[in-house]
Amino acid sequence: MEILMTVSKFASICTMGANASALEKEIGPEQFPVNEHYFGLVNFGNTCYCNSVLQALYFCRPFREKVLAYKSQPRKKENLLTCLADLFHSIATQKKKVGVIPPKKFITRLRKENELFDNYMQQDAHEFLNYLLNTIADILQEERKQEKQNGRLRNGDVDNEDNNSTPDPTWVHEIFQGTLTNETRCLTCETISSKDEDFLDLSVDVEQNTSITHCLRGFSNTETLCSEYKYYCEECRSKQEAHKRMKVKKLPLILALHLKRFKYMDQLHRYTKLSYRVVFPLELRLFNTSGDATNPDRMYDLVAVVVHCGSGPNRGHYIAIVKSHDFWLLFDDDIVEKIDAQAIEEFYGLTSDISKNSESGYILFYQSRD
């Protein structure tokens, strides 16, 4: 058995090496970007949800640069961010241009910190992205808080900071955070009230044979509040019919869009996949911005896509397609392949109905040009 396993591992390593050398030849030494590395990630038992998101984030350059800068800071106690920084640094400093890396330390830490991921079952890539970004932000805010406290103690200032004060935004917020404004207009007095809400990613409903632009417009459709759903107007001091709509007030540097492809079906008593064909362009501009939005004409370029392959949330596989310099790559755990830009169309989804086995875009990462 031991010999068989060793032979199997050796065969696997040989295959990885063959894939790596083929990719290097396909790109060519003259075209290969300086200081760039393309490394697949070993799957530790249904960890493709994690691998695909990590590859997408690695090729979101502002995020990668901040994580690598964090690595260069004085050594800190191990946490999820230090493990991520070690992984990114390991990829970025490899002598080889292409290859495979086992993200074992990161996966071990992830499973230790959150029981949701402490198993060998398929997890949701969007849940993982959400958890990762929020955890990193929490770590950075806690470290900043500790630094302030240590600074005050050194200066002899023992007064505690107001615990209710809003924490300063971190570089996670600077990169991914946008702001939505919820506008409600009373149909009696025409008074408009608005409430702001921050987001790190936007979850949008999907419809058959549409585009991401259409889905985003639907996200901002006007909703009429009437009957038992009437809105309490402060001006009228009574419940009134009203129009409500959501607009984008602040556009993020990197816009992460989550396509809501998993829907609970009452008759089936389970979630099923909406394999609808949703076109996502290489260039994107948002049209549902508020009147007071900063830089409302901001243009975005698609830099990465997390793709779900399969027919349901608990069955299937995740891969990532990323843009690096002027070409596109597909990361399927330890396999890395160069693909044509036209091949992205294969990941839009299917024109047929639900519950189909499909490879469809699930999380889109758009980076601002400015």
From Swiss-Prot:
Residues 39-369 form the USP domain. InterPro entries: Papain-like_cys_pep_sf, Peptidase_C19, Peptidase_C19_UCH, USP_CS, USP_dom. It comes from the Eukaryota. It catalyses: Thiol-dependent hydrolysis of ester, thioester, amide, peptide and isopeptide bonds formed by the C-terminal Gly of ubiquitin (a 76-residue protein attached to proteins as an intracellular targeting signal). PROSITE patterns: USP_1, USP_2, USP_3. One of its GO terms (molecular function) is deubiquitinase activity. It is found in: Nucleus; Cytoplasm; Cell membrane. Zn(2+) binds at residues 186, 189, 233, 236. Its main location: nucleus. The active site is at residues 48, 317. One of its GO terms (cellular component) is cytoplasm. Activated by interaction with WDR20; WDR48 and DMWD through different allosteric mechanisms. Residues 146-157 have a biased composition (Basic and acidic residues). It is an enzyme of class 3 (hydrolase). Pfam families: UCH. Residues 146-168 are annotated as: Disordered. The keyword Nucleus applies. Disruption phenotype: USP12-deficiency attenuates CD4(+) T-cell activation. In addition, USP12 mutant mice show significantly reduced tumor growth when compared to WT mice. Both the frequency and number of CD4(+) or CD8(+) T-cells isolated from the tumor are significantly higher in the USP12-deletion mutant mice. Interacts with WDR48. Interacts with WDR20; this interaction promotes translocation of the USP12 complex to the plasma membrane. Component of the USP12/WDR20/WDR48 deubiquitinating complex. Component of the USP12/DMWD/WDR48 deubiquitinating complex. Interacts with PHLPP1. Interacts with RBPJ. Interacts with CBP; this interaction blocks the acetyltransferase activity of CREBBP. Deubiquitinating enzyme that plays various roles in the regulation of the immune response and inflammation. During TCR engagement and activation, translocates into the cytoplasm and deubiquitinates its substrates LAT and TRAT1 and prevents their lysosome-dependent degradation to stabilize the TCR signaling complex at the plasma membrane. Plays an essential role in the selective LPS-induced macrophage response through the activation of NF-kappa-B pathway. In addition, promotes that antiviral immune response through targeting DNA sensor IFI16 to inhibit its proteasome-dependent degradation. Belongs to the peptidase C19 family. USP12/USP46 subfamily. This is Ubiquitin carboxyl-terminal hydrolase 12. It comes from Mus musculus (Mouse). The lineage of its organism: Eukaryota, Metazoa, Chordata, Craniata, Vertebrata.
